[in-house]
């Protein structure tokens, strides 16, 4: 199936990714997590993302489920994108961002980044306070996917919460 032309700037995200990351925030203890992340396109002009993660012990074994999220990335003009994220913990987000292509070799994107900022957050009555965040996804020179998530939540200012480096599955 051909990828719609307007999604080509995000084509480097497509596929299955697995790896390990770290988490921290002023209101919790630091932790390590394992993650499975997939980006897919069924031919329509959006990319679907599904992520699930687990808390890991010191030996790298799964201790318990950690987080899940689903998202849809939709193109806008000039390498800009909007994304809709949903979380089972009771909130949804609208994100806006821009893709930067840093290197192309043999007609393939080999280094790129997607920077995004929340535009709005909607949460259920029972969800924890979460104001907004920033995300950065990057295809780094070794072909891995690195990403970070900074958030403002539970009365704390914007600060790093998650970072991971994932390899193609």
Residue ranges of each PLM-predicted region?
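Hydrophobic/aromatic beta-strand elements that line small-molecule binding cavities or substrate pockets
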Residues: 34-40, 69-74, 94-103, 132-139, ...
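Short, solvent-exposed aromatic-acidic interface loops
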Residues: 52-57, 86-92, 121-122, 150-155
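Acidic, glycine-rich flexible loop segments
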Residues: 90-91, 109-134
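Surface-exposed, gly/pro-biased binding rims or lids
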Residues: 123-153
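Helix-adjacent hinge/juxtasegments
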Residues: 58-101
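Amphipathic/hydrophobic helical signal segments and adjacent flexible N-terminal regions
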Residues: 1-46, 54-65, 142, 150-169
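Short hydrophobic/aromatic-rich beta-strand segments that constitute the beta-sheet cores
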Residues: 19, 48-51, 80-85, 114-118, ...
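A generic structural signal for short beta-strands and their flanking turns/coil linkers
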Residues: 13, 33-35, 43-47, 67-71, ...
